[in-house]
Design a protein with these regions (language model features):
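Hydrophobic alpha-helix immediately C-terminal to the catalytic Tyr-X-X-X-Lys motif of short-chain
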Residues: 142, 146, 150, 183, ...
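A conserved pocket-lining segment of Rossmann-fold NAD(P)-dependent short-chain dehydrogenase/reductase
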Residues: 55-56, 120-134, 158-172, 182-207, ...
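N-terminal Rossmann-like NAD(P)+-binding domain of SDR-like oxidoreductases, especially those catalyzing
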Residues: 1-164
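C-terminal substrate-binding subdomain of Rossmann-fold SDR/epimerase-dehydratase oxidoreductases
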Residues: 23, 187-267
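A structural alpha-helix within SAM-dependent methyltransferase catalytic domains
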Residues: 35-36, 74-78, 148, 184, ...
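Residue-level signal for the nucleotide or nucleotide-sugar donor/cofactor binding architecture
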Residues: 26, 57, 65-68, 134, ...
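A glycine/serine/threonine-rich, flexible loop-to-helix segment
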Residues: 101-103, 173-181
């Protein structure tokens, strides 16, 4: 679960000029050497430790992977490829749990924002301060700000994508991350799914990986400096856990087996 080696093998089979380099982004000297040697035109930085829960158990590793390694990439760019473009896949978790403290309206199957100002979600100027992010959110936010800073300070073409729930047909999911794919897999295998708080009415903003790839392509074609984008599927593609249960069951014919943990998930 969560292993991406099969995806790599598929890429190697289907894309003739795909080249995989087994390189730990935490290794500063090797990252510097790679940039000096290869001099990439564009960098799409997707590497991450993606789990809230795991971050709390291994905070040093989480920060090294998410934050320090991003600095390795940025400084390598500055030294060897300052004209390159970098797209960093950040996360909406940079806003922490602050959105949960906005006034909410409870409906039968979901919560929605009561204030019409947030009818279509929150903007990029929403505060990232004085909120609980989870350690994962904090490490990703550190990298997010550093990408912006290298862009603004060194005039590096760059953006941070603060994505919703990215999903697609090749999503490698586990309980700790990969919401929609994991929920569907759990239903098909007739296993028990755990809901963490909020009565199962918490809403997830889902966006297909093809849409994310399309955005990245357009940004690289017309790059800007130090930009930030909230990238989601929009209200029409959002779904609460309760709603997802109903939708998946209508497709598979399997009733959702679940356990409700009343403790709200952090971040």
């Amino acid at each position: 679960d969560g292993d991406t080696s099969n995806r790599r093998k598929e890429l190697q089979k289907t894309i003739s000029n795909f080249k995989h380099i087994n390189l730990d982004i935490r290794n500063r000297s090797k990252i510097l050497s790679f940039f000096e040697r290869v001099k990439p035109n564009d960098i799409i930085h997707c590497a991450a430790q993606p789990s809230h829960d795991l971050a709390a158990k291994m905070p040093f590793e989480d920060f090294d992977i998410n934050a320090a390694s991003t600095l390795n990439i940025l400084e390598s760019m500055r030294r060897y490829t300052p004209k390159s473009t970098i797209v960093y896949l950040s996360t909406n978790k940079v806003y922490g749990d602050a959105p949960n403290f906005l006034k909410l309206k409870e409906l039968n199957s979901r919560y929605t924002f009561a204030d019409k100002k947030y009818a279509n979600g929150i903007n990029e100027d929403f505060s990232i301060d004085q909120t609980k992010h989870s350690l994962f959110g904090a490490s990703k936010l550190s990298a997010d700000i550093m990408v912006q800073e290298y862009g603004k300070y060194f005039d590096i073409k760059s953006c941070c994508i603060r994505g919703g729930c990215l999903t697609g047909p090749n999503h490698s999911s586990v309980q700790l991350h990969g919401f929609l794919n994991f929920l569907i897999k759990t239903n098909i295998l007739k296993k028990k799914y755990t809901i963490f708080g909020y009565k199962g009415k918490q809403v997830r903003d889902n966006i297909h990986s093809k849409d994310v790839a399309s955005f990245i392509k357009h940004f690289i074609e017309k790059p800007r400096i130090g930009e930030v984008y909230n990238l989601g599927g929009g209200k029409n593609n959002s779904v609460s856990i309760k709603e997802a249960f109903k939708l998946v069951s209508s497709i598979t014919g399997n009733e959702m087996i679940y356990y409700y943990n009343k403790i709200n998930r952090i971040g």
